[in-house]
Amino acid sequence: MLRRMNFSVFAVMTFAGLFGWLTVSGQLVDGFAQDTKSQPASTAATQLPMPDPAFKGRIGETYKDSTPSYPLPVKASKGSPNVLVILLDDVGFGMCSTFGGPVPTPHMDKLANNGLKYTRFHTTALCSPTRAALLAGRNHHSCGTGVIIEMGTGYPGYTGIIPKSTALVSEMLRDHGYATGMFGKWHNTPEPDISPAGPFDRWPTGLGFDYFYGFNQGETHQYYPTIYRNTSWVPQPKSPEQGYHFTADMTDEAIAWTRNIRAADPDKPWFNYFSTSGVHAPHHAPNEWREKLVGKFDHGWDKQRELTHATQIEMGIVPKGTMLTPRPKEISAWEDQPADAKKVYCRLMENYAAYMAYTDHEVGRLIESLRTSGELDNTLVMYVVGDNGASAEGGLEGTFSEIASLMGVQLGLESSLKRIDEIGGPTSEPHVPVGWAWAMDAPFQWTKQVASHFGGTRNPMVVHWPKGIQSKGQLRTQFHHVIDVVPTILEACKIPEPKTVNGIPQKPIEGTSMVYSFDNPKAKDRRTTQYFELATNRAIYHDGWVACSKYGLPWETAGRGDGFLKASWELYHVNEDFSQASNLAAKEPAKLKELQAKFLEEAKKYGVFPLDPRFSERMDPKLRIAGDPKTSWIYYGNSVWLPEPIGPQLFPRPHSIAAEIVMPKGGAEGVIVCAGAFSAGWSLYVKDGKPNFRYTFFDIADVTIAGSDNLPEGKVILKTEFTPDGTREGGGTLKMIVNGILAGEGKLKRSAFRHGLEPFEVGRDSITAVSPDYKTPFAFTGTIEKVAFELTKK
């Protein structure tokens, strides 16, 4: 009887569970007429993702007397606009023709003539911080991104890790029914996470983007990029000789993505974050675009600033009476440059400008595709013209290889002059000299990195949305910041700010919507306070005034010391002094003191402390490694591909490489292991039966060490041992050993812990060849059983 009763209860409970007869407490209810009410829309809409919809049908005993209610995906409100956020890179306020600059940008002009031009819009002065703030709607320190991700340290404002409490607009839009895609430069994934093992929650696809096509790091070679599709590396679709350039490639991808979204769902709005490489170094422009600008900058950087300033006043971009700030004493006058220097500097600037003009062309292609499809009218375009000011990181002379500069190597004017005809092409990695960067930031002081002055932080913006904005071709002068983009998008799309995302309470959005200014040019500013800070360059804007303190030079990225605590402060009444030209600190000490106190208040509020002037010193990967750093690595097989920072960090430390390979009958050839690129890198390979080790270092310390004999058939242990000589240049002796017998030896004059933009690989050299002895991919045709690396104590 007991068994029968238990079975009966079990049967009733099972049947009741199927049809919903029981409450949580176990009481029977009338499940055949249930209609559970969903949460109020206002609550559900602020909890992302939204809760599963309640069942609204009717369940009877059989399907014939039941009414289904299929759960549908969240849909955006009818008529919701598409959103296109375009972000350029390292573009100064005075570069583009749209804002009075010398570089022709007709597609940006066209968009602005049918939209709005914001001339008091601001960024953070550096890449990753601006990008995090742009997408999160919070200040860069609130997003853990007080510096670029490669410089993250263990403080909340500087981790280089966007917290889960600051969800991105991509997550908000996706969870409200938008398709989301990201194309181009990301630069917000912590460097240790950029690997096949992830974790992937900090990649674009883990932060709200359905689709990603681009690169994770701060820059890439435009002819030989390191591209990811979602979370997987993909080879470029064609070669530079076939016309390949990454800017065109990412544009093709973005156009195809929007067309496929529309083909699959005619009503689904999309969010496209289109973040170009242009015009971050290396500056790569197709030859036909360079040819268009030959001779355009022969007058030099001083004259160019004067011309730009005059055009800006004539166009109304800057108010009448705006002063042109003088050249800093640290930058030489154009007239003092030697003839050969002028020749090189003009070529570098022509190439830089051509890169901008070409980028405008590709952005225009994307815009025209939307015009053709009829989608442009209801697409909110927010076109941010630079993530910071123009870059002075090319140094006073510019450079043929900015990768060399990043590694602390100044190739000098002679190197650029020798290879002047290659500038802008696939064999170059060029960057303009400081003087041209300063000229492109007219009328302001300073450049990228300098968050204290508008040359680093004031980037113009174009807004275009025919269906949502009546005004056309007008200026907007309200003071705004990159954190204001997200609340603007949310208001335009009628989406509430989320309170929780994935169960995590959210920090309030710190930006202010700009929608109020769309059709009201005289609207009173709604952003009255904004702090700025980057590597101790700091400023505070409050009610039309700016107090600021600059420290260090942006092209000197090491050894800045701690003098920032004694650095002087300046004061500007920027409501009347557009260009920060008249320092009022001595005349208005009370106002300066008031603003200094305001900066401290904002800095404490948003996690700016501790201040840290170090720049290149913070690039040390050991600052971001938990536990003891690795001293040995083993990789198996013929196919390993890793970003170089994730692979073994060998040079200039003492180390050994031991490859266990099998040479088939008749021999084999190919790359066993390599890291880096054509300009700098190392490769251990077999050619014509003999082992070779190549170290390439910007044509100034290249060396190939070849083995004396052919490798024997069968199993071979091929080993290299490097012993540093203790010099600052990282030179040393490298021995090549085959099956325990010395087979070759040579000297490396220089070496470095990192070699640019290309990966570490076992079994091939996929992108550009480290050695001129072979062409990519030069895959090894024998068998690689394993390759072991060890840091030694010699």
What are these regions (language model features)?
Residues 588, 592-603, 783-794:
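Extended recognition patches within non-cytosolic domains
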Residues 610, 614-794:
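Extracellular glycan-associated modules
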Residues 17, 28-570, 578-597, 611, ...:
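Formylglycine-dependent sulfatase
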Residues 10-27:
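Bacterial N-terminal signal peptides
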